Each structure stands twice: as C-alpha cells, then as structure tokens.
C-alpha cells in the first residue's frame, strides 16, 4: 500500500482529524489519527494489516514467532497481524503504571517477538513495551506499525517497519503556533486510561 492509499483508508473511516490535539506523548498537534475509527471496521483493518504483514515478511521472512502489542491501541492491529502471519498474538498492559504480561500470557527465551503498534509518534509506548518483553528473556527482533508519525525519527530501540510514514508536526504545550493556540485542546488518546 502506498502512503496515499493508507491515508485514504483513514480518511474514509473518518479517522484523519484536524484540530488541536494532546497526543499520548503530551505533545500537541493539529492532526490526529483516530485509529479506533479504522479498527471499528474489520475489513479496513484487515486490508491495512495484510499489507503490513506482507511488508514485515519481505523484511524479516519467517523470523517472528509471536506478536506482542501494547494495550490498548495495539490490541486490534496486533490481533489482526497475528492472524495474517499465523502467529500467536499477546499484549502487555499497564499495571502500576508499567507494561507487563498478564492474563496468563507468557514468553520464553526462545521467542522472537514482533511488537505491533498502531501509530508511532515518539516511540515512548514502544520502548516501554519492549522493556517489558525484554524482562521475560524473549528477544524483540523488530516493531511494526501502521503509521509512523515521526517520519522515521522515532527511536524504538529495534528496527521499525511502518506501513507508511506520515510526518505531522508536534509541539510542546509552551511552543504552540498561533493557529493551535487559538483552538481548545482535546485529548483523544489512550495513555493514562485505567
């Protein structure tokens, strides 16, 4: 899928929003990708994840043995990527503010993990997810995401395979451009949810 095709899927789902948004990282942006709207449509989600799975296979072959995603945003694409790749799909979730495997999920030292995220902006959630996986003894070999908002600048600590890059400016709250200062901010992301 091309960048335009990926963004067309987001637009068609009403998921490419404009306004003043507080991102999960705390940065502010005039554009927000509301992936929940994309993921509410199974066929659209399947198309995007099928294309991402093909890209992952082209770069990694059959190296991954398990998919792990961070809750909450990564659960749906993680599940669909696991389905597309014929792998088990697990997720980490926050407990006392830190990602951990729960619900009886386990990894072994032999597991070669592909982390699957929805959108990568700064890479913070990715790094936290990878840290939790590393504590299990498993090896994270790469991360895959639908959209890399950083334009390739985010450092997640492992190779990042993005279906597309979509560089969107993001600003600290005290360095907003005038057009964002004039609009009330909303926080549509999931960081901080219980």
Curated annotation (Swiss-Prot):
Q: Which UniProt keywords apply?
A: Glycosyltransferase, Magnesium, Pyrimidine biosynthesis, Transferase
> What does the record give under GO molecular function?
magnesium ion binding; orotate phosphoribosyltransferase activity
Catalyzed reactions per annotation: orotidine 5'-phosphate + diphosphate = orotate + 5-phospho-alpha-D-ribose 1-diphosphate
Q: How does it assemble?
A: Homodimer.
Main function = Catalyzes the transfer of a ribosyl phosphate group from 5-phosphoribose 1-diphosphate to orotate, leading to the formation of orotidine monophosphate (OMP).
Family per UniProt?
Answer: Belongs to the purine/pyrimidine phosphoribosyltransferase family. PyrE subfamily.
**Name this protein carries in UniProt:** Orotate phosphoribosyltransferase
Q: Which source organism does the UniProt entry give? A: Maricaulis maris (strain MCS10)
């Amino acid at each position: 899928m091309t960048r335009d095709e990926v963004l067309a899927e987001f637009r068609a789902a009403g998921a490419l929003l404009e306004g003043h948004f507080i991102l999960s990282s705390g940065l502010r942006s005039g554009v927000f990708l509301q992936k929940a709207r994309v993921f509410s449509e199974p066929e659209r989600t399947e198309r995007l994840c099928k294309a991402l799975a093909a890209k992952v296979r082209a770069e990694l072959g059959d190296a991954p043995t398990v998919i792990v995603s961070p809750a909450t945003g990564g659960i749906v694409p993680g599940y669909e990527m696991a389905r597309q790749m014929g792998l088990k799909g697990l997720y980490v979730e926050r407990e006392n503010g830190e990602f951990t495997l729960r619900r009886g999920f386990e990894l072994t030292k032999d597991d070669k993990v592909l982390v699957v995220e929805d959108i990568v902006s700064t890479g913070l959630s990715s790094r936290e997810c990878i840290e939790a996986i590393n504590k299990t003894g498993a090896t994270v070999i790469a991360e895959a995401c639908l959209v890399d908002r950083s334009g390739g600048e985010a450092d997640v600590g492992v190779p990042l395979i993005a279906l597309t890059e979509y560089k969107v400016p993001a600003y600290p709250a005290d360095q907003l451009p005038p057009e964002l200062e004039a609009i009330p901010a909303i926080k549509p992301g999931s960081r901080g949810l219980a």
